[in-house]
Amino acid sequence: MVPRVWSLMRFLIKGSVAGGAIYLVYDQDPLGPSDKSQAALQKAEEVVPPAVYQFSQYVCEQTGLKIPQLPAPPKFNFHIRDYWNSGVIKVMSALSVAPSKAREYSKEGWEYLKERTK
């Protein structure tokens, strides 16, 4: 009984995290135009560190553990949106050629196996 409940809990937690990520991408539109991506990144830089601090304080109070102070996040001296968009473009191009590359590699592997079995 306990393994089934634990399995269900894991499924629900993973599903809620995935659903939250999908909602966040839909709501903030980080894969859209560069100005929206930059605005979403700046908003995340402002919101995430205080939320992590509050959560760590809550965990400390509830469990009695002492969590060391995290270092400040690094400041970037370049426009991350340029690199972000180029990364998205590269990933999407790799995904678009993946089926043809998989077919090509499987064909080469099949030919190799035919040669070896002769």
From Swiss-Prot:
Superkingdom, taxonomy of origin: Eukaryota
Q: Its Gene Ontology biological processes?
A: cristae formation
Membrane spanning stretches: 8-26
Query: According to its UniProt record, where is this protein located?
Result: Mitochondrion inner membrane
Pfam families registered for this protein in UniProt: QIL1 (PF15884)
Q: Does the keyword Magnesium apply?
A: no
Q: Does the keyword Mitochondrion apply?
A: yes
| Chief localization | mitochondrion
Q: Which InterPro entries does the entry mention? A: Mic13 (IPR026769)
Q: Which family does it belong to?
A: Belongs to the MICOS complex subunit Mic13 family.
Put simply, this protein is called MICOS complex subunit MIC13
Q: Which organism is it from?
A: Sus scrofa (Pig)
Tell me the gene name.
MICOS13
